Amino acid sequence: MTLIHPTAVIDPKAELDSGVKVGAYTVIGPNVQIGANTEIGPHAVINGHTSIGENNRIFQFASLGEIPQDKKYRDEPTKLIIGNGNTIREFTTFNLGTVTGIGETRIGDDNWIMAYCHLAHDCVIGNHTIFANNASLAGHVTIGDYVVLGGYTLVFQFCRIGDYAMTAFAAGVHKDVPPYFMASGYRAEPAGLNSEGMRRNGFTAEQISAVKDVYKTLYHRGIPFEEAKADILRRAETQAELAVFRDFFAQSARGIIR
């Protein structure tokens, strides 16, 4: 059963599936689709060509699907796509994509996005991430699965943060953060391996050791980057936990933190 507060303003063209709950004074635009059993708190605003999956929980004053903060945007029908089982807390802002990017902003499944976080246009967020309060992404940022962003983390446009990586409080990410690694500092630098996150997600001691050796190869052995990368890619052919480095290196446009 869909439950809509009488003060909510929902365009007749919006599509709400069964079990959706909408709180007081929330506004939902005409091109919005909301999946089953998603709960939307009071005073939220959902606009644009926005698709939201099932079993999400969206808190009060969230702003989803507004136009991107890009002066080149000319009201093109770009999109915001949100998956299933996400928690989206108070005062978060997720913008539509742009035609100069991929045309959509995408959020996967089971993400925990805390208050005041900002996801700019054309960002792609994986699954099972945690964004602590006030983490902000510029446009075209890619965040992998199981990433943890510390509070007030700022990520520069076009940066990538690999699977299972973690940033410290107020990290300023200006280059790509490889999978499994931690980053900290105003101009983020390598800060070790996210070994605790790996353990919590079922990695064995042997797998963690293999990734730790990758970290040492990149940062502690004095090897030129291209030589270190070639060595890591060779190892990735036989070690499954290192396979993520193949795609990461291939798709990196800004270079990695050093």
UniProtKB/Swiss-Prot annotation:
Domain of life of the source: Bacteria
Enzyme Commission number, as recorded: 2.3.1.129
GO function term, MF aspect, one: acyl-[acyl-carrier-protein]-UDP-N-acetylglucosamine O-acyltransferase activity
Record-linked InterPro entries: Acetyltransf_C, Acetyltransf_C_sf, Hexapep, Lipid_A_LpxA, Trimer_LpxA-like_sf
One Gene Ontology CC term in the entry: membrane
Alphabetical GO biological process terms: lipid A biosynthetic process
Subcellular location: Cytoplasm
Catalytic activity: a (3R)-hydroxyacyl-[ACP] + UDP-N-acetyl-alpha-D-glucosamine = a UDP-3-O-[(3R)-3-hydroxyacyl]-N-acetyl-alpha-D-glucosamine + holo-[ACP]
Pathway participation: Glycolipid biosynthesis; lipid IV(A) biosynthesis; lipid IV(A) from (3R)-3-hydroxytetradecanoyl-[acyl-carrier-protein] and UDP-N-acetyl-alpha-D-glucosamine: step 1/6
Swiss-Prot/TrEMBL keywords: Acyltransferase, Cytoplasm, Lipid A biosynthesis, Lipid biosynthesis, Lipid metabolism, Repeat, Transferase
Family listed: Belongs to the transferase hexapeptide repeat family. LpxA subfamily.
Quaternary structure (record): Homotrimer.
Annotated function: Involved in the biosynthesis of lipid A, a phosphorylated glycolipid that anchors the lipopolysaccharide to the outer membrane of the cell.
Protein name (record): Acyl-[acyl-carrier-protein]--UDP-N-acetylglucosamine O-acyltransferase
Organism from which the protein derives: Neisseria meningitidis serogroup B (strain ATCC BAA-335 / MC58)
